[in-house]
Amino acid sequence: MPRPALRSRSLRRVYVKLPSGKTVIHYERKRNDIAICAICKKPLHGVKTNFLHKYSKSEKRPERPFGGYLCSSCLTQLIKATVRQQLQ
């Protein structure tokens, strides 16, 4: 039975075969998926995906409105649409 900290499903199980032929389980942190834009579903550039706990908040995503949520092209379209709507 693994120790209680390793029973959690937040850790991914990797089966490793040793030179002796014995198979053991190694526990690793799960990898994060690539961040995608909420509108066009393209992958976001400038958003880190690995070991997020090691980075500060400003390093994890771009420092702009909707950074880490929308890509730059969708953001420009959104800003233009809101400005045009305000002018009417």
UniProtKB/Swiss-Prot annotation:
Keyword Ribonucleoprotein part of the UniProt annotation: yes
One Pfam family linked to the record: Ribosomal_L34e
Source taxonomy: Archaea, Thermoproteota, Thermoprotei, Sulfolobales, Sulfolobaceae
The organism's place on the tree of life at top rank: Archaea
GO molecular function: structural constituent of ribosome
Any one annotated GO CC term: ribonucleoprotein complex
Protein name: Large ribosomal subunit protein eL34
InterPro entries reported in the protein's UniProt record: Ribosomal_eL34, Ribosomal_eL34_C_sf, Ribosomal_eL34_CS, Ribosomal_L34e_arc-type
Keywords, ordered alphabetically: Ribonucleoprotein, Ribosomal protein
Example of a GO biological process term: translation
PROSITE patterns: RIBOSOMAL_L34E
Similarity-based family: Belongs to the eukaryotic ribosomal protein eL34 family.
